[in-house]
Every structure is written in structure tokens, then in C-alpha cells.
Amino acid sequence: MAESVASSESLPQMKPEEPESKKSPSREAIPKDMPVVNVRDIMMYVENMEGMENKKLIPYVVYLDEQFKEIVQKRRKDARVVFIFMIAIMSMLVIGLVVCGVKLLGYLMEQK
């Protein structure tokens, strides 16, 4: 029994947990008004850089670059144009299907 008492005394004691009121330094370092940067925008920017040796960029540094802003704006405009184009094509297809359905229905009604 003396051995079991000695072994229990050698166990490390747990320290009381400190309150989590301390904020992480990373949260304090980033201001709330800093704009959010999309990772896909950064990757696209890096892919479009020609002749640049260092392609490992820090997002908040890249965001300040005018070329980055221009590329992102151009990509967003292109995405809007493609979206509008797809909506137009889909609406034409739906209208075409409705017209074909009506004509087929009229043809079938005449057959009876």
C-alpha cells in the first residue's frame, strides 16, 4: 500500500485553467474595417502575373496593389456578362420548349 500512496503523490497536479479573457494577438492586429480578400482572387492575380519572380504574396499587401484591383474588377465584369448570357440562353431554350410543346399538343389534338 505504501507503493500506491507514493505513486499517487508523484502524479503531476493539474494547474487551474486561466480565464479565456485574453484575446489572441492576431485578432487585435487586424482592424475591423480591413476589406476581405477572396483567396480565388489572389490565386487568379498570381496566375496573371507575368515576369514576376516572387509569387508568394501576402493577401493584405496584394489587395493594396492597383493591378490586383483592376484584374478583380475585370473578372467580376466578365462573370456578370457570362451570367447574363447564360440567363438569356436558358430563357430562349425554355421558350422554345414551351412553343414546341404547344405545337405538339395541337398536332396530337388534330390527330384524334
Curated annotation (Swiss-Prot):
Location of the protein in the cell: Membrane
Q: Which residues cross the membrane?
A: 81-101
Q: Where is the composition biased (Basic and acidic residues)?
A: 15-31
Ranges for the region named Disordered are 1-32
State where it is primarily located. membrane
Q: How does it sit in the membrane?
A: Single-pass membrane protein
Which superkingdom heads the taxonomic lineage of this protein's source? Eukaryota
Q: What is this protein called?
A: Uncharacterized membrane protein ECU04_1080
Q: Which cellular components does GO assign to this protein?
A: membrane
Q: Which UniProt keywords apply?
A: Membrane, Transmembrane, Transmembrane helix
Q: Where is the composition biased (Polar residues)?
A: 1-11
